[in-house]
A protein has these predicted regions:
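Non-catalytic, surface-exposed connector residues within folded enzymatic/regulatory domains
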Residues: 37, 69, 86, 112, ...
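N-terminal helical cap/lid subdomain that shapes the substrate entry/recognition surface
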Residues: 2-103, 119
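Conserved phosphate-coupling serine/threonine residues in phosphotransfer and NTP-handling enzymes
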Residues: 13, 111-113
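Asp-based, Mg2+/Mn2+-dependent phosphohydrolase catalytic module
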Residues: 1-4, 114-228
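Proline-centered flexible-loop/turn and helix-kink motifs
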Residues: 103-104, 127
Length: 228
């Protein structure tokens, strides 16, 4: 495969932010909703989506007495401090470095997060970003017409790297993001899913002659030989 670039999702792929989002959303639900706890039945439709979709799903599911925009603003207030200490997922600190310096790939990030939230959650890893990441595309970029599961963000990230998606490997954890990566035309998609979504990902229908889908338990299992 003629792979020249690697594109990484952020939440749940590079950084372990999903529990932070859950806690912040739960605080808003407790304050303005019906007191229910977030369940996987709802959360599975939220993982990997844009913040706008994410918030609308929660508002509708838990009868929140706020608009989606108000929910987002309140939730984001609860995210600021925890983001400052969020950790890398297993193998996620090393893999982009390896892609850039050992495999000689251009490396990008494509995240559904807004620029504001991206900067908050990466404030403590600025040097790592500078060293390992060539381009970053956030979910509120005006050039993105549709969020995941539409492929727009990955197509744009590849373009920012000066590449076509078919020359990229894309790393994702969420079903919506994996579908977006496949739809972009990427030659290879590396999925590191929540175990609860693994079955759904294994059952994705796609053109196996166009895209190779690799499913791993954690990113430290990745090696370029898996693509070839």
């Amino acid at each position: 495969m003629d792979i020249k670039g690697a594109i990484f999702d952020m939440d749940g792929t590079l950084l372990d932010t999903e529990p932070i989002y859950d806690l912040a959303a739960q605080k808003v639900i407790d304050e303005f909703g019906n007191g229910q706890k977030i369940t996987w039945d709802v959360k599975q439709h939220v993982v990997g989506t844009s913040s706008k979709i994410h918030c609308k799903i929660f508002v509708d599911a838990y009868n929140i007495r706020l608009t989606p925009e108000e929910f987002e603003k309140k939730r984001d207030e609860y995210l600021i401090e925890p983001f400052k200490s969020c950790k890398f997922m297993k193998g996620a600190k090393e893999t982009p470095h390896k892609c850039k310096y050992e495999y000689n790939l251009k490396v990008g990030i494509a995240t559904s997060s807004s620029k504001f939230n991206f900067e908050n959650k990466t404030s403590h890893i600025k040097e790592w970003l500078k060293e390992n990441i060539d381009k970053i595309v956030t979910g509120d970029d005006r050039r993105i017409k549709k969020g995941k599961p539409a492929p727009d963000i990955f197509i744009l990230a590849a373009k920012e790297l000066g590449l076509e998606p078919q020359n990229c490997v894309i790393f994702e954890d969420a079903l919506s993001g994996i579908n977006a990566a496949i739809s972009s035309g990427a030659k290879c998609v590396v999925a590191i899913p929540d175990p609860r979504q693994r079955k759904d990902i294994e059952n994705i229908k796609y053109d196996k002659n166009r895209t190779k889908l690799i499913i791993l338990n954690s990113m430290d299992e990745f090696d370029i030989s898996l693509i070839n």
